[in-house]
């Protein structure tokens, strides 16, 4: 068995050390280091970090983007812009691609259209949704549509204890809402305040939803690999009257990915379930800026940083964004490897040779690197297990019948 790296006591001890910090108010976590949080527009409360570090009488400003959101995302304000820094660490989750532009009106019209079709069939609407942000975004949009009488008085059940708790957190911070959400809150008396909205608490309440028709069930997890959503899919996925709506990214190897890509049968809790429900997808909710969104955020920078470190993405995504920044923005952009270190005071790269004095013609000078040690950690047992499960799923999909699937799995078991 795998031993946990921490337990509940460790978690409680860590939580007891947390303290909240207001945005835009600098604080000093250590001597000669000042930190300021700015709105990142990714999820409620998300921030990018401005760090001013002073050493030997010299100060360097480092900005760490973390996850950056898109402009015009539901509820929360657009990401702040920052004009100047010495060094930038920027994410690249979608650094190599752009999504189709989906406006607010297009998104709302699609919801109304899908709801209308589902209600005609007389079944349930099942929506796998992340507990954080996605559930609240959907409730916000559904509230707008109900206010405009674009969708009926169909009951909406949020069947996720975590989503319920997070929704309460949203209600505490109206100062984070954008202008549209603020207006909705004023007009409706609350951002999620409608008699058709219901939050389940107990497992028994969740089970009772199986007995109801003409309802909407929002439940986690968003990729259908855990949580109450698996029970709702098991009981409803087979029925042609029902509709399943995907509103978020479905990672390779997940149950949500299989269903959204058109699988005719899936296994849930060891039972083979036919996919008879109508499968729909609604776009426009991503909390991640795509390539154009990242470039738009970077456009606010008035003078190119001394160096931009492109991180937090698949290698091809990071390389694509770095290449664009070098080619079109004349940024010095690099994709650092895990274990590399950089001296920001003299701006030299840390590697395996002695430190040399930097001159204007030398980009990086190697001093020390722990990259080889880190390389062996990049793919740990959890990564390898995930890869194995993906390969097994692919193997099963290519089998023509149950007999072949059993034979292939038995061969794998024999190898073990």
Question: Positions of the model-derived regions?
Answer:
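Charged, amphipathic alpha-helical linkers/stalks
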Residues: 339-404
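Short, compositionally biased "basic patch" segments
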Residues: 74-93, 174-180, 250-276
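His/Asp/Glu-rich metal-coordinating catalytic cores
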Residues: 1-137, 141-155, 176-179
């Amino acid at each position: 068995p795998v031993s946990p790296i921490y337990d509940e006591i460790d978690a409680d001890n860590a939580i007891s050390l947390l303290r909240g910090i207001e945005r835009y108010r600098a604080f000093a976590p250590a001597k000669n280091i000042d930190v300021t949080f700015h709105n990142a527009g990714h999820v409620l409360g998300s921030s990018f970090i401005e760090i001013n570090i002073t050493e030997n009488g010299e100060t360097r400003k480092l900005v760490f983007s973390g996850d950056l959101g898109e402009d015009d995302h539901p509820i929360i304000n657009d990401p702040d812009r920052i004009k100047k820094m010495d060094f930038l660490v920027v994410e690249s989750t979608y650094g190599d691609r752009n999504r189709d532009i989906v406006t607010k009106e297009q998104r709302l019209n699609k919801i109304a259209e899908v709801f209308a079709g589902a209600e005609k069939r007389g079944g349930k609407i099942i929506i796998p949704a992340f507990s954080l942000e996605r559930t609240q975004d959907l409730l916000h949009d559904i509230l707008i549509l109900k206010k405009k009488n674009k969708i009926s008085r169909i009951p909406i059940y949020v069947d996720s204890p975590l989503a319920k708790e997070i929704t309460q957190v949203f209600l505490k911070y109206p100062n984070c809402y954008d202008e549209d959400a603020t207006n909705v809150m004023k007009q409706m008396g609350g951002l999620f305040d409608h008699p058709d909205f219901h939050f389940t608490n107990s497992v028994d309440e969740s089970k009772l939803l199986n007995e109801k028709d003409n309802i909407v069930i929002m439940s986690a997890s968003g990729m259908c690999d855990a949580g109450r959503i698996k029970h709702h899919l098991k009981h409803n996925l087979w029925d042609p009257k029902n509709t399943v709506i995907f509103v978020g990214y479905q990672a390779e190897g997940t149950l949500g990915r299989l269903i959204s890509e058109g699988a005719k049968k899936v296994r849930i809790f060891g039972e083979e379930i036919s996919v008879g429900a109508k499968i729909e997808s609604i776009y426009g909710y991503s909390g991640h800026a795509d390539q154009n969104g990242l470039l738009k955020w970077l456009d606010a920078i008035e003078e190119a940083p001394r160096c931009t470190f492109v991180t937090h993405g698949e290698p091809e995504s990071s390389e694509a964004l770095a290449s664009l920044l070098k080619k079109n923005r004349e940024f010095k952009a690099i994709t650092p490897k895990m274990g590399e270190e950089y001296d920001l005071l003299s701006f030299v790269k840390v590697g395996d040779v002695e430190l040399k004095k930097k001159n204007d013609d030398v980009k990086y000078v190697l001093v020390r690197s722990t990259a080889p040690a880190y390389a062996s950690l990049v793919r740990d047992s959890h990564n390898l297990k995930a890869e194995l499960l993906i390969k097994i799923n692919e193997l099963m999909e290519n089998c023509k019948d149950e007999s072949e699937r059993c034979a292939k799995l038995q061969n794998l078991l024999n190898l073990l």
